[in-house]
């Protein structure tokens, strides 16, 4: 297993739209496992491939410790390839979010309370999943990454600029 470096804002790759995966191969599955290890290493709940510099429509999610919904034992981790949101609730919920590509930042984001997605699973089989609560939020957050959208994009221009300046300063002090 490999642990990848995390791409952090204001890196321009995070603003690009990811491309579909053509086929779920052994190489794709190894990459997803490496993404998962990287996510665990960064104490994340989810990770999009773009966050490790690969512009493919792949997500990994594991929130079993925080999910209020009782799920089958083998439900997590979720490997989600080429997701599309096919349904969103009209009920909106605002909650505080963090992101491993935006270190030390917490932002209030309003999102639909539930979503239904269609995707390919770990084996390349088509699946549908209706998610609500925290899982819906994590799916939407990670899906935004595939679309080149960050949680700071939900802020006003002024607030977004302040956060991005902080991140740039943080990045320059670290590198």
UniProtKB/Swiss-Prot annotation:
One of the protein's GO biological processes: translation
UniProt enzyme class: hydrolase
Keywords: Hydrolase, Iron, Metal-binding, Protein biosynthesis
Catalytic activity: N-terminal N-formyl-L-methionyl-[peptide] + H2O = N-terminal L-methionyl-[peptide] + formate
GO MF entries: metal ion binding; peptide deformylase activity
SUPFAM superfamilies documented for this protein: Peptide deformylase (SSF56420)
InterPro entries: Peptide_deformylase, Peptide_deformylase_sf
Cofactor, free-text remark: Binds 1 Fe(2+) ion.
Active site: 142
EC number: 3.5.1.88
Cofactor(s), by name: Fe(2+)
Binding-site list for Fe cation: 99, 141, 145
Gene3D superfamilies reported for this sequence: Peptide deformylase
HAMAP family: Pep_deformylase
Its job: Removes the formyl group from the N-terminal Met of newly synthesized proteins. Requires at least a dipeptide for an efficient rate of reaction. N-terminal L-methionine is a prerequisite for activity but the enzyme has broad specificity at other positions.
Family: Belongs to the polypeptide deformylase family.
Protein name stated in the entry: Peptide deformylase
Species the sequence originates in: Rickettsia prowazekii (strain Madrid E)
């Amino acid at each position: 297993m490999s642990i990848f470096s995390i791409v952090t804002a204001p890196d321009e790759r995070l603003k690009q739209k990811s491309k579909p995966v053509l086929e779920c191969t052994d190489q794709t599955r190894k990459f997803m496992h490496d993404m998962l290890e990287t996510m665990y290493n960064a104490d994340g709940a989810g990770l999009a491939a773009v966050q490790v510099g690969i512009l493919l429509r792949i997500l990994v999610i594991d929130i079993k410790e925080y999910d209020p919904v009782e799920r089958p034992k083998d439900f997590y981790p979720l490997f989600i390839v080429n997701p599309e949101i096919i349904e969103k609730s009209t009920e909106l919920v605002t909650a505080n979010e963090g992101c491993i590509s935006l270190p030390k930042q917490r932002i209030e984001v309003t999102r639909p309370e539930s979503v239904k997605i269609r995707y390919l699973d770990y084996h390349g089989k088509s699946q549908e999943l209706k998610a609500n609560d925290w899982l819906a939020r994590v799916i939407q957050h990670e899906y935004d990454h595939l679309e080149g959208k960050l949680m700071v994009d939900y802020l006003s221009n002024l607030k977004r600029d302040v956060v991005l300046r902080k991140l740039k300063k943080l990045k320059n002090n670290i590198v």
